[in-house]
UniProtKB/Swiss-Prot annotation:
EC category: isomerase
Binding-site residues for ATP, renumbered to this chain: 30-33, 51, 87-91, 415, 480-482, 496
Transmembrane segments annotated in the record for this chain: none
GO MF entries: ATP binding; ATP-dependent protein folding chaperone; isomerase activity; unfolded protein binding
Family: Belongs to the chaperonin (HSP60) family.
GO cellular component, one term: cytoplasm
Protein name: Chaperonin GroEL
Amino acid sequence: MAAKEVVFGGEARARMVEGVNILANAVKVTLGPKGRNVVIERSFGAPTVTKDGVSVAKEIELKDKLQNMGAQLVKEVASKTSDNAGDGTTTATVLAQAIVREGFKYVAAGINPMDLKRGIDKAVTALVAELKKASKPTTTSKEIAQVGSISANADETIGKLIADAMDKVGKEGVITVEDGKSLESELDVVEGMQFDRGYLSPYFINNPDKQAALLDNPFVLLFDKKISNIRDLLPTLEQVAKAGRPLLVIAEEVEGEALATLVVNTIRGILKVVAVKAPGFGDRRKAMLEDIAILTGGKVIAEEVGLTLEKVTLADLGQAKRIEVGKENTIIIDGAGAAGDIEARVKQVRVQIEEATSDYDREKLQERVAKLAGGVAVIKVGAATEVEMKEKKARVEDALHATRAAVEEGVVAGGGVAFLRARQAIGGTIKGDNADQDAGIKLVLKAIEAPLREIVNNAGGEASVVVNAVLAGKGNYGFNAANDTYGDMLELGILDPTKVTRTALQNAASVASLLLTTEAMVAEAPKDDAPAGGGGMPGMGGGMGGMGGMDM
């Protein structure tokens, strides 16, 4: 086992704080509307340019082991905030640095770190309660757009795209972000349920312009096994032909004679049929067939529930207003399923999401919820270069998370104002059990000025002047760093999701408390470099002599 270096007390904390400062100083330049960029080297290709705090934090790894531990703990603040709220990573880092810096002074002055931590926790709990009180629900499209714009570093087009997407697919719908093909970002909405399986034969196409098979008011047959014998299908086909409506067959596989007969019937115009493979694999396939059944008001024909193809009646078939089957996708629009059944199914899948352990499973389950809830919106991010595309895509994803957070818990005044107002609301009401806890409370109440100070510094202003001016105002009165003016933050559209603000403060305080209560650090000792090999391998000088006498 390699030798370890153990450092105690003040020295340990000092080295850790150095690491915290290095990471936080690199991250905090990105804060606010006038935040600067950070350029990150890549091992190959062009460097990445970003204004996203968590992207900067993730790249930082320090040579000094003890400094690195401090930096990694603060990195945890950024990534945890990003995971929980999707935004607010820079704010969280700035707060963590401020709490550590202030707290370090108190600990150095001999205050008990454990009581200091308890004081910090008390202050944070009180502030979070005030933030929740001040929170204002986000309902209108305009408010959603404002939140999206702020989170995307004051880019209004992104905010508007997200608001439009939420209008189209609802607050619960799935919104995905993809690389666009043009310079402009655009929104693409797929209504109804889409799954990634297309027609089994191009002969089913009935709309050559779209290269798709369009079925109006069709029946839907869902079968969980292969269909290769046409005799199995005949009873169903006869009933559907009598009803004079088209049919979509979704099965594990339709092959051989069965597929050939369906194609011939379609070409001759006797019956309008399209066959597609069932989406997914294994258990997921069963679940998706069940989803389609609930959406269309039909049943999955499966032997395990006592249904066979010969016994199928029209009542067992699903129905929809319209179905489009392309080469690779099938879209079911306006299924005839009962709203109550669909809602119950969505609830059921939501419970599975809560219990899912892997990210992949969670993502697939969320896709199923979206498909049932009615629609998927795709934001296609446009940019001139690959580098800009990556940077912009990261911002859109951030903004999307922030908007979801705003819809969930509402918004508070942005620009660091909410913290100051929460502090004013608390006034001197919270008291610790002793002087050391009071110090912890005082420390947090001072540290929460940090985000506003940093926004002002990045905008080239004088932080103390602005903080005093904001404190002199009331309510949502704050500083708009984009154009150096003061006003009502909510009216100016400078909003932060309550969840983001709250999570940033809680995570920052949690990690800062850990740092302040550290008394010893253990890291691998630096290796003593072996002397350079200048004089190695003596006695090699005179080798290979005596070769001269060889005749060539």
